[in-house]
Amino acid sequence: LTQLNFSSEALAFANISNVKDIATRGPITSDHIIRTKPVPVIIAPENPQQSLDDFSAAYEAYFERYTNGTQKCLDTAPRWAVWKGHGTIAFGTDLTESGIVSEITEHTVKAIQFAENLIIEGSSGGWQPVSEKHLFEAEYWELQQAKLKSENVKRGAQKIIPEFQGKIAIVSGAASGIGLACARELFAQGAVVVGLDLNPEISTIFCDSGMLGLLCDVTDQKAVLYAVEEAVRQF
């Protein structure tokens, strides 16, 4: 799941000419690395998939540079992104996870820009995190991984993963009857659910976190397209 940040602050950061350089130097604290990985993916609007593929390959290379042979490479998916010309994106397997990453990203964007504008006597200033080797040691430090595992246990992540966790379900006729029952079951199985209906009360029926109710006539192609776009913006 994703949380898009198209705020003026995120947009300004994404529009910085050297954003790829300053955003990929490292996190503002090594404590963040278990949530954000060392760097974000920089999404090139002309080829988003290639950007993701390049990130995955770069992460594997980073692991190979510093592993002592005893560690197991973590998954190579990014945890946040800078979408050039648009803003930032936080990724997570559920809304709690993506929300944590989104909050960290907001602080990171501000801190990087503050550091870039900071001029210290005898120094050129600029954003300079710790070395990449130190970041690797922090990311793969047993106590860091144990900390993340402990936090996940507290929010129930050690339980059986729901079948539809990380999925987005769109249900038509969702304000009542079979549609509502299906929506509730999908939600119970871990999906975030977008409910569509002609009933104007759909927005109040779907008021829980992880649910979105939209007034929509499914025979209207433009209305359905709008609903899909809203689902993307929300989740």
Task: Tell where the protein language model's regions lie, with residue ranges.
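A glycine-rich helix->loop->beta "capping" turn
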Residues: 230-235
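Canonical Rossmann dinucleotide-binding motif of NAD(H)/NADP(H)-dependent dehydrogenases/reductases
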Residues: 161-194
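Glycine-rich flexible loops
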Residues: 1-169, 181
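Helix N-cap at the beta1-alpha1 junction of Rossmann-like dinucleotide-binding domains, i.e.
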Residues: 198-202
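The beta1-alpha1 cofactor-binding region of Rossmann-like NAD(H)/NADP(H)-dependent oxidoreductases
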Residues: 215-229
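Short, conserved active-site loop motifs that form the nucleotide-linked donor/cofactor pocket
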Residues: 210-211
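The conserved SAM/SAH-binding core of class I Rossmann-like methyltransferase domains
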Residues: 196, 214
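Short alpha-helix adjacent to the SAM-binding motif of class I
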Residues: 204-206
